[in-house]
Amino acid sequence: MSSDFKRPLLILSLAIVAAGAAIHLDSSGPPTFRAAALKAPQAPQTEDQPELLRAFAALEPIDSHVHAFKNDPEITDLMERLRLHILDICVADAHSIYGSLDTETARAKAFIQASRGHARLCVTFDPYSFHQKDFAQKTVELISREFAEGAIAVKIWKNIGMEVKTPDGRYVMPDDPAFQPIYRAIAKNNKTLVAHVAEPWSCWQPPNPDSPDYDYYKENPQWYMYMHPDHPRKEVILAARDHLLAENPKLRVVGAHLGSMETDVDDIAKRFDRYPNFAVDTAARMEYLMIQPREKVRNFLIKYHTRVLYGTDLEFLPDESVADALKDWQETYARDWKFLATNATFQYRGRQVQGLDLPAPVVREIFHENAVRWIPGIDSSPKQAVIEP
């Protein structure tokens, strides 16, 4: 362990809390994946986990991207110990491992009810029925009922743009006019749209074992667009997402998974500059921040300190053991804290990574304040993002 990292992390976390959230700072083709650090043997990083988690918990962290569809008091106890709040997100997936959408939503609601106030609901809708005449009306009625019962956000998923088609075979994009009444209803109710649109660039590239997503596409070939050249290109899907943002300036949109602009933070920055109603979460894409140049990522997170929400994409599924979930959740939170809040050097998936050691107020905003701003209702704070006209 480096001498820099030996300073007590609890002191660091208290400094972050004291600093508060206010910080005033200025705000041609797919890239090929390149490792930005030397490969090294993987080593377990568990000896400092309790200290890391104590520092993490001091911020009352918010994980804005979780899929929890099973109850267990040990998970609830963990959330209490970590002072953790989560957004439990439902997904409308024809290939779902979560069960039918109704079953999935019921399980999420049961988890939230048992969470002792530590979880809130992000609902979704069935996009495969979008061609039906009353689709928009029924969907608006559905999400309005869910809002009345406590849901605070709505998700659209990557099947919009990559799988859902019209009866005549046209791929449906996220800016399709059929969705406009739904987006207007979300904005009118002061809720947030969580948009998982498109996929990492590796989805359209030849297989590369060095890619962070190699195993996912190996196990889920239906989403590996390199093998489906007749499907829309990523550029087309992201352009439709950008049009959605432009057409709905009063709609708060959180782009899941770094907004599918994971390989270069400059691409995210361009959207932030163009669309004040847009933020991103880090769910399942922290590794992409680790492999980009350290100072570039650090400067990006400092400059756009109010626009990046902490998220993980952690799961707790009906067939998963609580022991496995506890291990995964704690390891993920400890590792992400180490990367964002310290300058420690550590091994992750065979790469040597140095922590970003972000300023204390920026760390607090990423782990807590930004979720409060962009997803009102995720805790009891009245703060929310103000979208300028």
Locate the predicted segments by residue.
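Hydrophobic faces of well-ordered beta-strands that scaffold small-molecule active sites
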Residues: I62-V66, I86-I89, A119-V123, V154-I156, ...
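Active-site gating loops and adjacent loop-to-helix segments of metal-dependent hydrolytic enzymes
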Residues: R34-K39, A58, L82-H85, H118, ...
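H/E-rich (His + Asp/Glu) clusters that bind or coordinate divalent metals
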Residues: K39, P229, K234-H243, E247-P389
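Hydrophobic alpha-helical membrane-insertion segments, chiefly the h-region
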Residues: L12-D26
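Active-site gating/metal-coordination segments in enzymes
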Residues: P44, L52-R54, D102-Y224, P276-A279, ...
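An N-terminally biased module of ancient metal coordination in phosphate/nucleic-acid-related enzymes
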Residues: I23-H118, Q137-K138
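Acidic-and-aromatic substrate-binding clefts and catalytic sites of carbohydrate-active enzymes
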Residues: H65-P73, D93-E104, Y128-Q137, V164, ...
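N-terminal Sec-pathway targeting helices
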Residues: S2-L14
